[in-house]
Amino acid sequence: MILNDSTIMRMVSDGLLISENFDRGCLTPNGYDLRVDAIDVEGRQYSEFEIGKNVHFLVSTIEILKIPDDVVGMIWTRSSFARKGIFGSFGAIDAGYHGNLTLSFFNAGSAVNLRRGERIAQIVFVKMIGSAEKPYHIRSGNYQNSRGIVKDPVAGSQIASEAKKN
C-alpha cells in the first residue's frame, strides 16, 4: 500500500519517514519531493553547478530519512529533469534505514544548472505486509546514519566494522 499525503504527514509528526528538514511544500498526494543538498562532480562538491552533457554526478539530499521497519522507499527522477535528459539509478530505500541519501544521476541532454534546494527526485513510501525480520540497520547498515555525499560505506557501519576485524 502506498502512503498518501495525510499518512505521510502523521508519520513525519511522529518522527518517522523524514526526521529532519521536512518541507510541507515538497509533499505530493502520494509521496515527497527530495531536494538537492550538495552536488558532486568528479570528486568536487558544489552548492550550485552547471551539469554538462554526458556528465555523471552525485547529489546528497537535504532531507534526513528515518524509514520504519515496515516501510520501504521507492525513488524516481522528477519528470521535469527526465525531460531535460537527466536520468537516475536508484535502489529501494530499505526498511530500517536512517540518514540522508546520495543519489546517482547522468545528464544525457544539454547543460542544466542545478542548485541546492532544488527538487530533483520523488520518494514514494510503501507499507510492507509486516516488519522486516532483519531491517537495514541489522542486516547491513552500510550507509546507516550517512550525512552528505557518501561514496563508500559509512565508517562504523556493521559491515565496515566486520570487514576491519577480518
Swiss-Prot record:
The keyword Cytoplasm does not apply. DCTP binds at R78, S79, S80, F81, A82, R83, D94, Q122, Y136. It comes from the Archaea. Keywords: Hydrolase, Nucleotide metabolism, Nucleotide-binding. Its EC number is 3.5.4.13. The keyword Ribosomal protein does not apply. Pfam families: DCD. Pathway: Pyrimidine metabolism; dUMP biosynthesis; dUMP from dCTP (dUTP route): step 1/2. GO terms for molecular function: dCTP deaminase activity; nucleotide binding. One of its GO terms (biological process) is dUMP biosynthetic process. It catalyses: dCTP + H2O + H(+) = dUTP + NH4(+). Catalyzes the deamination of dCTP to dUTP. HAMAP family: dCTP_deaminase. Homotrimer. This is dCTP deaminase. It comes from Thermoplasma acidophilum (strain ATCC 25905 / DSM 1728 / JCM 9062 / NBRC 15155 / AMRC-C165).
